[in-house]
Amino acid sequence: MAKQQDVRPIIKLRSTAGTGYTYVTRKNRRNNPDRLVLKKYDPVVRTHVDFREER
């Protein structure tokens, strides 16, 4: 059975380059309550760009 409010929810990281490319990952809400921003590789534009958390 799943908990009501999961501590480690599955989130989508969407590219800020506007390509629509996404990564799927999990995050710990207790350690990172804010929206996550990670610099990752976007294969559509073939460079590293910021990926922001989408809910």
Curated annotation (Swiss-Prot):
**Which cellular component, as a GO term, is one annotated location?**
cytosolic large ribosomal subunit
Gene3D superfamilies recorded: Ribosomal protein L33
InterPro entries (UniProt xref): Ribosomal_bL33, Ribosomal_bL33_CS, Ribosomal_bL33_sf, Ribosomal_zn-bd
* Any one GO biological process: translation
Which keywords appear in this protein's UniProt record, sorted alphabetically? Ribonucleoprotein, Ribosomal protein
Give this protein's Gene Ontology molecular function annotations: structural constituent of ribosome
Family, according to the entry, reads as follows: Belongs to the bacterial ribosomal protein bL33 family.
NCBIfam families (UniProt xref)? PRK00595.1, rpmG_bact
Q: What is this protein called?
A: Large ribosomal subunit protein bL33
